Structure formats: C-alpha cells, structure tokens
Swiss-Prot record:
GO BP annotations listed: cardiac muscle cell development; heart morphogenesis; myoblast differentiation involved in skeletal muscle regeneration; negative regulation of cell population proliferation; Notch signaling pathway; protein localization; regulation of membrane potential; sarcomere organization
Keyword Phosphoprotein set for record: yes
Protein name: Xin actin-binding repeat-containing protein 1
Protein family (similarity comment): Belongs to the Xin family.
Stretches for region Interaction with VASP: 1-54
Xref: Pfam families: Xin (PF08043)
C-alpha cells in the first residue's frame, strides 16, 4: 500500500511537466534564450492554471503529512478559542455589531417582521372581547387561517386605515353582529391610537396607506437626569433623501438623529443629519427626494395629545431654481380674510406702553391724574444724565421738581471744547421762572425714548409743550454755534478726514465683563466748506473713572487735535529728517522740535497737559487712587507699508503723568529680508518671540538661518543609511508605505530622495474617481449570485492577523441597484472568536450557508449546520469546512474569508460564511504593505509577487545599481547564492523561488557562494545543463514508476521522499514561471543577461542527487535568505 502511494505521488509532476513543456519549451542551449512573451499572455487563465496545479499537488500529499496539517489547523483554532476571557478586540467588535444591528430586534426574537403581510380578522369581535373581558368560545369564531399575533399595533392600524369597521369581516357578518349586539362599539384602544397619531382629516382616507415615511427608526435612547428627560432617536432614510445647504449644494442624508429634551416647562427638539456629497455616487435623480422643510403638528383634545413631525420633500429632478421678483408675491386684497389686523395690533404692542392699550385713553377724562406733571425739557435732562456725573447735580438741581433748562447767550445744547480740562460744561439756568401752563407728557416722551433713537427726535422743531421765547433762543444759539463752534472729524486708514455728525455708544455687560462699542456717523468734510482752523480731529477716547465715596462716575473724554497742527507736523517731519542726516548718530535725549516725540506726546496726552509735561517728569508724580484712566488711541496708518529694511518691532511703554497712567501698545509687522546666499535652495526662517516678564518689558529676537554649504546638514526628508542597522523594521516599513515598488532601488533605500510620489494625472482632473473598496467588491461578488444576500446586515471580513473589517450594508429593492455600504470600519479582533460570540446568541438560525469560489470564478453554495444555542461551541462541533475557513482567517491569507450577518423573514439572524479568490489588480505602481508582501512570499503567490515586483528598464545601463555593485570594480557583478539545505521548509523554498534578482549592469559576471569562493561563468553554465539533466532524470524515474530506495525501509511511510518530491515539483513550477517572466534584452550579450536566483538554487538543490558534485553546500549556513535582498524587488 505504501508502494502504491509512493508511485502515485509523482504523477501530477509528470503531467504538469508535460504541459509546461508543450506550452513553454526549454531552449536548446542556454546561450540562446528566446525573448519573453508579452504580458497579455499571462492572463487570468494562466493564474487559474497555476492555482489548480498547486491544489492537485496538495491532494497528492502523503496522508500522514496531510493529517499533520489538519492537526496543526485544529491546534491553531484551539489556541485562539481557548481563552474564555474576551479580549479588547472582541469587545470592540461586539460593540460595533450591537450599535449597527437593529436595536428593536434584540431581545424580542418572536416578534414578526414590521412589513410582514397580515391577514384580515374580526376586529369588532376582538374589540368587544377586550371591552367585556369574555374570551370563552373564541376558538370557534376565529378563522382557521394564519392570524396576526396578539397586540400587533401596526397590523391593526393598517386595517383601520384601509377598511371601515363594518367591512372587516363582510357585510353579512356585520349585520348578524349588529342584531345580536345592538350597542356594538369599535376598538377603543386602536381608535385612541389613531386619534393620537393621525389628524382628523386623514382618518379613513385610502391614500394614507401609500404614504411612506422617509425615516425608519433604528434606535432610541432615553436618559433621565432629575426632572430632565432626554430622548435620542436614530433614523435611517429610505428611500434616498437629500438636503440642500445655504450655498445651494445638495448632500445625501445618510442618517438622521433627533434629540428631545423635556423638563418641567421646556421642551426642545433638535435634528442632526449625517450627510455626504451627492456626487460621490451614481443614483437616479428621480429616486432622490430633497427635504424642503420640517414642520411639527400638535393636536390637543381634552385627554389626548398628538405630535407629528412632517417632512416636506420634493423630487430632485423636479427642482427648477427660478428667480421671481418680490412683486409677484404681493398678497391680493381679495384673499385677505376680514378680521383683526394682526400686524397693526403687533405694532401697537411693540410701540405703545401697556397702560395705554388697556383703554386708559378712553377713561382718561374720568380718572383724575395720580400725580401732577412738572414741566421740564426731557431731552436736556436726559442729556445731562448721560454726560454729567451724579455728584455735579447736588448743588444745582433741586429734589422733587425738575427745572427747565434754559440757554444762555452764546451757548447751546452742544459741548464746548475747553483747553483747561477737555470736558464739556452746560450750566443749568436756575433763574427761569416756572410756568404752570407748560406741561410735559412723561408717558409720551418715555415711549419716544424707548422706541426711537436720540438723533431721530426732531431737534429743529420746537416742542409742542415748550415756550416760544425758548425756541427763539435755541435757534439763535444754533446760528451762533454754526459759525464759532468747531467741527469734529475723524481720520480713516487712507488718511481721509470725515466730519462727525453723531456719536453713539453701546455697552455690553456679560457677567463681570463690560464691553463698549463706539459708532460714528460721518459725512464728507469738503461738503461743509469750513476753514481748517475750526476743524478738530478726534485722536482718542479716554475713559476716566472717579470714585467718590460709594458713587462711581465714568467720564468719556474725546481728545482732539486741530487740523492746522497736523499740517504743520507733516511739514516739519521731512525737515527734521533732512537735518539729522543718514550718517549722524541718533540723539540720546529728545530735542526740541523732535517730530517723533511731539507725535507721541500728541497721541498720549491732552493739549492742556503738554505745557506741564517736563515739570511733571521732574517732580514726583502725584498718584490718586480714586481715579483710573484708560485711553484707546486711533492711529491710522497707510495701506502701503513703508518699504525699508529698518527694524520694526513691538513697542510697549508706560508713562505716569499727573493722576493717570497711559499704556500704549504699537504692533507693527516685520519684513523678511531677502537671502543673499548664492545657493538659493536653503530656506531662511525667522522666529520672533516677545517675552514680557513681571514688572519689565523686554524683547528678544532669535533668528535661525540655514547652515553654510561647507557645514554638515541633515535634511528633514532624508535618512542616513549608515545610522540604520541591518534589518531596520521602521526604515523599510516607511519605504513600503510611502514609496512605490518601482522606486525601491538602492538609491532610494540610501535615503537620497525619499519623497512621496504623486499620482499621475491628478492635477488635470478636478475630482478623482472614487475607488471601489474591498468590502464593496465582496458585496458585489456575493450579490451577483442570487440566493446569498436577501436583507441588509453586517459584513465581517478578515484583513490580516488580528484585523477585521466591519461594514454595514443596505440592500435595495430588487431592480433598484446593487448593495451599498453605509458604514465601514477597521477594528482589531480575530474572526473565530467573533463567530463564537455570535453563535451564542439565541436568535441565530441553525441553517447557515457556505459560499466558496472555484477556479473558474463560480460561486458554490453549500448548506452549513451551525451549533445550537445550548451547545458549548467547541471546535469539534463545527463543520470541517467552517473550521478550514476560520483557520484561513487567522493568519495572512490570499483568499478573502469572512462572515455575513443578515436578518431572515422570521426575525432570526442568518450567517453566511464565504471564501473568495483574490481578484486581478492593476499593474500600475502602487503603495504596498509589508504584510501583503510577506504574505505573498510565505504563501508562494506568484501572481501577486509579479504584480508588485520591480521591472527593470530596457537599457541595462539606466537600471538602478545595488549597494554591492557600487562597492566592487565596475567590470564585475556578484550574485550571492544561498544553497538549499536538506532541512529547508516549504515556506523558505517559496521565498527563494519567488524572489527575482535585478539584472547586472556590467559585461562580465561571476557567482560567489557563501563560503567566499568565486565560481566562474563556465561552471555556472554547466550547472544549468546539469539542472536540465536532473529534470530529465526525475521525469524518467516518474515515468518508469520505480522510486528511489527509502532509508527507513519499504514498509514504513517515506515522508522524507514525499517532501522531496513535493519540493521538487514546486521548484520546477516556479522555475519555469520565473524563466518566462524574466526580461532579456534582445541583441545583448547572453553572459550579461540576468539569471534568476531560482536557476542557481535548482543547480545547487541536493534533492536531485545529480548536481551535488559541482556545487557543495556550506555547513552551518542558514537555509533562509537574508531579509535585505528581499527588498530589491
């Protein structure tokens, strides 16, 4: 029996060898290798053919070896599933599944589906039973067919909406019921439910059944904190809905969330929409509905309250943005219903006081006034309260009665600019006799002050209750003021002056913070026609706080400057600059007539204190604690900054003067001088830092410049190769994640140009095309075969050791398109552990489905029996096919394995396990992953290695040179060969066979073995010839059916011989594949062509027993190839 098995083992090698010889014959001589065929020849057929050959080799593995492999798989699964304690990845995955699975399906597994068709029933009889409480003899009255489950509110609501009560069981049965029970009533519970949820005008209407809410409730969370109840409801939009932002862009609404917060007397609701751009996918515009508005309908009855949210939608293809004038929307007088004028009533409430709206005007003649109104000028009094401190009225104003403010000669109601203190004084006229006939309507003026701004009150018109003589005095005062009083002006950033017509101040108090906002109303200065001597420019506003006892007074002072002084200052400035000269040293002390000093004095001090400035500096400053002053200076600058290399900085100064302290902060920009270096590529960076310690103002400036050309520098984007040890994981991980495979040559590894390659054509296109993800590709493959996906659910796919891709997908109606992913996330976890956690649920359907893809691309469906809820969930209880699929999901596998959770019609969770073949990817250079490359090498995936390998250019001189070729003389190239050992494993052989070597760029070549002895080119050619002879010898042995003698005896299973035969067959397949895929330049010297490492390995393989005399393996050498040459792909 053992002999028969050993005779059958080499059989696949013979057939594969024969097919390979027929399709790709060996050259007659090693000197004349044919040119490689084009890439199009190696299509998917070739890849499937190689995969089928590997499967056939696996079938003919020795039974003992196959049994050992199955035991190793079972041990791996037992090791993963052995610990009962959940890991961090398990908790994260199960939480993700809990959040994205329907919450209403958890814990209620016997509830029928929401859209399950419900057959009709006798609703009237059922309602009567509920009202009377009689449930006897109910079996004979119930129909024998399928009845809806008890308490199905949705089914009862649908029946009440579509059918009348007397027609639910037919007219005859309704008549008999009425005869037996004259006082037949309806379903009170259902009717009340209808009245609470539906408006009265919609009850019983048939079109209501066709209305579908665009929102579908997925989860509801209620939080109760004290008397505040917060409800968060998560909806999903079906069908597709969109929303339009303020800019007109339309976004798809993926999910909607509504937060309701309800307390004692406050109830608020907020809608949150999760959106994505509408152009990111292709959808039919007729299927998209744009949400135009959300309205809330509330209905109140004596004991019933109803609230309904209504979404007003519009089809996307029906939107026509048309600009319509406002005149088209004017209301027609015929459509205005007769009734109270709401706008007029609203205007009255906004403008009139409450006591005038209660009918006080009609009863004014009957009710005597409560208090006699004292005549007075309300405008002057209000002006006094806004401008004068409270302590100024103690000696001038009488308590109890307001005195009328009169005008003295040459004075008006405006301020006078006095040079002594800069304040405005308006004395009160106490000698004006009171006139009993003059009365002021306080309520009217109060209404005016509450509703109208101060500048809009008619100042030129005489008051209706004022005196005629007083009005004449006001006009004369205004005329005299127009010729003598100065005009205040402000200067903008452009240097232009504007006359001030009104000044208003807003004060904002929030907690302990007070803010002031000044607004100036101006007009052009040239329209006034005034002389410069009567124009004062407002330079700053000073806020002065005076505390006297318990009363605090705030005084705002406008500091002005005559316009003529500004012109003199501008004329003196260039004269002073010319007098200094460019070479003269700057004066240490400010001289008389220094423009900068005078300007600083004008900006910080009022005019009345400039004469006493020097004396105040010599003497000790008198500090008054009860007075604080803070000045904001208006320092307009030109829009075009001065172009000069002078140093600009931040200036902070504190000057005590008299009873005030002024702080001035001048922030100016800092220009970057041009670099005078000749290189031009070294950047110059300036970093300015201002440090202000306690009690002292200092300025420090640090300038960091680029190093000189002769100094050593380490660029930020380069990595020194000498400082990196051999096998640095961080270095090569960075290379594989940031550089394309085609640029991983020795120069890029050395760190000269480690720059990320930009994709070609990205600048020409405005929006790049969206790439299909791996999860979407898997869903598309599963959806192509009917019977696999029948409901939306969760997709779990293994991406690598300890990584899972969880995706929530939505399955549209049949004919509406393919499924799409609503949410996708990459989490940590093991697929077998998650499967075991899912199988512990009580609502899992025991009848599962296993989907496997064959070599032809067809999906094979097999039923899968899952353990029940009561089973412990051991490895032995699972299906063998499921065990093999879970074992593939543990490590790095080429095939895509995963699990699909979806809901059945009975509310159960159906599990579908799948294993798909890897699909063909583009040959364009792309960023690779270290895990993907390691998996391809370990598994022997020739197609993936070929798609990721580096292809040399046609010109051998332009190819990248390795580090070894740079250290040897230019006339030689060294190929390092690691011989095979008899204890080499299959994974190591696949690594050596699938690792091509870059072609040498020199004319001559030699082979250096690990023992350090070079081998000439002729022995290398002899080794290749002997390799062919060894292949022929093996072919003859397999054809004759006489295997070699086993050292263990003919009776024992020869495991060593089976391993050698399998190793030889795999090496043959890989050698043939590498020979065809290797590029050989036409017309070049055959000696200079690239020889794959596989050829030398085959020449040195001791399994053949023929070529051991030419090349001997070195004792103690490693069987695995070092990690550094693996990077030269």
């Amino acid at each position: 029996m053992a002999d028969a098995q050993m005779q059958v083992a080499p059989t696949p090698t013979i057939q594969m060898r024969t097919e390979e010889d027929l399709s790709l014959p060996h050259p007659s001589a090693p000197e004349g290798l044919p040119p490689p065929p084009p890439k199009e020849t190696f299509s998917k057929f070739q890849q499937q053919r190689q995969a089928s050959e590997l499967r056939r080799l696996y079938k003919h593995i020795h039974p003992e070896l196959r049994k050992n492999l199955e035991e190793a798989v079972a041990e791996d699964l037992a090791e993963v599933l052995g610990s009962e304690e959940p890991t961090e990845g398990d908790v994260q995955c199960m939480r993700w599944i809990f959040e994205n699975w329907r919450l209403d399906a958890i814990g209620d597994h016997e509830r029928p589906a929401a859209r399950e068709p419900v057959s009709g029933g006798n609703v009237q009889a059922t309602s009567r039973k509920f009202e009377e409480g009689s449930f006897t003899n109910s079996s004979d009255q119930e129909p024998e067919g399928l009845r809806p489950s008890g308490g199905d509110v949705q089914a009862a609501r649908q029946m009440f909406e579509t059918k009348p009560l007397d027609a639910l069981r037919g007219q005859e049965e309704a008549t008999q019921t009425t005869m037996r029970e004259p006082a037949a009533t309806g379903d009170v519970q259902g009717t009340r439910k209808l009245f609470e949820t539906r408006p009265l005008d919609r009850l019983g209407s048939r079109p209501s059944i066709q209305e579908q809410s665009p929102l579908e409730l997925r989860s509801e969370i209620q939080e109760l904190k004290g008397d505040v109840k917060k409800t968060v409801k998560l909806f999903q939009t079906e069908p597709l809905c969109a929303i339009q932002d303020a800019e007109g862009t339309i976004h798809e609404v993926k999910a909607a969330c509504r937060e309701e917060i309800q307390s004692n007397a406050v109830r608020s609701a907020r809608w949150l929409f999760e959106t994505r751009p509408l152009d990111a996918f292709n959808q039919d515009p007729s299927q998209v509905r744009v949400i135009r508005g959300i309205s809330l309908e509330e209905g109140a009855l004596p004991d019933v309250s109803a609230t309904r949210w209504i979404f007003e939608t519009q089809p996307l293809d029906a939107i026509r943005e048309i600009e319509v004038d406002e005149k088209d929307f004017q209301p027609s007088p015929d459509l205005i219903p007769p009734g109270p004028d709401v706008q007029h009533q609203r205007h009255l409430f906004e403008t009139c006081s409450l006591d005038t709206l209660k009918g006080e005007r009609e009863t004014e003649a009957e009710v005597p006034p409560k208090e006699e109104v004292i005549p007075g000028d309300v405008r002057s009094t209000l002006w006094l309260f806004e401008t004068k401190p409270l302590d100024a009225f103690r000696d001038q104003v009488q308590v109890g009665h307001l005195q009328r403010v009169g005008h003295q000669e040459g004075e008006g109601l405006v301020t006078e600019c006095l040079p002594s203190n800069g304040t405005s004084v308006l004395p009160l006229s106490q000698g004006v006799p009171q006139n009993d006939g003059l009365k002021g309507d306080v309520k009217t003026f109060k209404n005016l002050f509450e509703t109208l701004p101060l500048d809009s009150i008619g100042q030129g018109e005489p008051s209706a209750y004022g005196n005629i003589n007083r009005g004449q005095n006001t006009d004369s005062a205004e005329q005299s003021q127009g010729s003598d009083a100065p005009v205040y002006a402000m200067q903008d950033s452009r240097g232009q002056l504007h006359a001030l017509t009104s000044v208003s101040r807003e004060q904002v108090v929030g907690g302990d913070v007070q803010g002031y906002k000044w607004m100036f109303e101006t007009q052009p200065l040239d329209t006034l026609g005034r002389s410069p001597s009567t124009i004062d420019v407002v330079r700053g506003i000073t806020r002065q706080e005076v505390v006297a006892g318990d009363v605090g007074t705030t005084r705002w002072l406008f500091e002005t400057q005559p316009l003529e002084m500004i012109h003199q200052q501008e004329q003196q400035k260039p004269e002073e600059e010319e007098g200094k000269g460019p070479g003269g040293p700057p004066p240490e002390l400010p001289k008389k007539g220094d423009v900068q000093t005078i300007r600083w004095l004008f900006e910080t001090y009022p005019m009345s204190e400039l004469a006493e400035k020097r004396e105040s500096e010599v003497t000790d400053p008198v500090s008054k604690a009860e007075t604080q002053s803070c000045t904001w200076m208006f320092g307009p600058q030109s829009l075009n900054p001065a172009e000069g290399s002078g140093e600009q900085h931040l200036q902070t100064s504190q000057v005590p003067a008299g009873d005030r302290q002024t702080d001035r902060h001048v922030f100016e920009t800092e220009s970057l001088p041009a670099s005078n270096q000749s290189s031009g590529r070294k950047p110059v960076r300036y970093c300015s830092r201002v440090e202000i310690p306690s009690g002292q103002v200092s300025r420090q400036k640090e300038v960091f410049q680029a190093l000189e050309a002769g100094k050593k520098e380490v660029p930020e984007t380069t990595i020194n190769l000498g400082s990196i040890p051999t096998g640095s994981v961080h270095k090569f991980t960075w290379l594989f994640e940031n550089c394309p495979m085609g640029s991983l040559a020795a120069e890029s590894i050395r760190g000269d140009n480690l720059q990320e390659e930009q994709p070609k054509g990205s600048a020409g296109h405005g929006t790049p095309e969206r790439q299909e993800t791996a999860a979407e590709r898997t869903l598309r493959t599963l959806h192509a075969t009917p019977g696999i996906l029948h409901h939306g659910g969760i997709l779990m796919e293994a991406r690598g050791p300890g990584e899972l891709c969880l995706a929530k997908y939505v399955l549209p109606s049949p004919g509406q398109g393919r499924p799409y992913i609503r949410k996708e996330e990459l989490v940590c976890g093991e697929l077998p552990r998650i499967v075991r956690q899912v199988l512990r649920r009580t609502d899992v359907d025991q009848q599962g489905l296993l989907v496997q893809e064959d070599t032809a691309g067809q999906l094979q469906l097999h039923p899968l029996m899952l353990p029940g809820p009561g089973d412990p969930g051991n490895i032995e209880d699972m299906d063998p096919e499921l065990q093999q699929l879970l074992a593939c999901g543990l490590g790095v596998s080429v095939s895509k394995t995963g699990l699909v959770m979806q809901e059945t019609g009975q509310g159960l969770v159906a599990l579908t396990a799948y294993s798909l073949q890897p699909q063909l990817t583009s040959r364009a250079p792309e960023r690779s992953s270290v895990q993907l490359l390691a998996s391809c090498i370990d598994k022997g995936d020739l197609h993936s290695l070929h798609s990721l390998r580096w292809e040399p250019p046609t010109d051998p001189s332009s190819g990248p040179a390795t580090e070894e070729s740079q250290r040897v003389p230019p006339t030689e190239s060294i190929i390092h060969v690691t011989p095979l050992d008899s204890t080499m494993e299959m994974g190591q052989l696949r690594i050596s066979g699938s690792t091509p070597c870059p072609p040498p760029s020199r004319a001559a070549g030699k082979v250096v073995l690990p023992n350090g002895k070079p081998v000439a080119q002729a022995p290398l050619q002899e080794a290749r010839k002997k390799r062919d002879i060894s292949h022929a010898g093996q072919k003859g042995k397999a054809a004759s059916g006489r295997p070699e003698a086993s050292p263990l005896g003919s009776g024992a299973p020869d495991l060593q011989e089976a391993m050698q035969n399998l190793r030889l067959a795999t090496a043959e397949a890989q050698s043939l594949h590498q020979q065809v895929l290797s590029r050989h330049p036409q017309g070049s010297d055959p000696v200079a062509t690239s020889m794959p490492v596989q050829d030398v390995l085959q020449a040195s393989t001791p399994a053949t027993g023929v070529t051991q005399g030419s090349i001997r393996p070195v004792a103690g050498s490693e069987a695995r190839i070092p990690a550094v040459p693996r990077k030269l792909l």
